[in-house]
Amino acid sequence: MKPSEIREMSIEEIDKKIRELRLELAKERGVLTMGASMENPMVIRNLRRDIARLLTIKREKLREKR
């Protein structure tokens, strides 16, 4: 996700997206733990970065409200 796309979202939408991505990350880690080889090993890295990006922009939005 691009930061510009995230900034257009509301805080509730950001929270929902974070939950979705964390669930997907847990599934991907579960597959990896079971010993299966991943088609694209960058998936976990990209999910973690997207979650971090969402949390950062959420924090920015909350600080603006103060």
From Swiss-Prot:
Part of the 50S ribosomal subunit. This is Large ribosomal subunit protein uL29. NCBIfam families: L29. HAMAP family: Ribosomal_uL29 (MF_00374). The gene is rpl29. The keyword Ribonucleoprotein applies. InterPro entries: Ribosomal_uL29 (IPR001854), Ribosomal_uL29_CS (IPR018254), Ribosomal_uL29_sf (IPR036049). The keyword Cell inner membrane does not apply. Transmembrane segments: none annotated. One of its GO terms (cellular component) is ribosome. Belongs to the universal ribosomal protein uL29 family. Pfam families: Ribosomal_L29. Keywords: Ribonucleoprotein, Ribosomal protein.
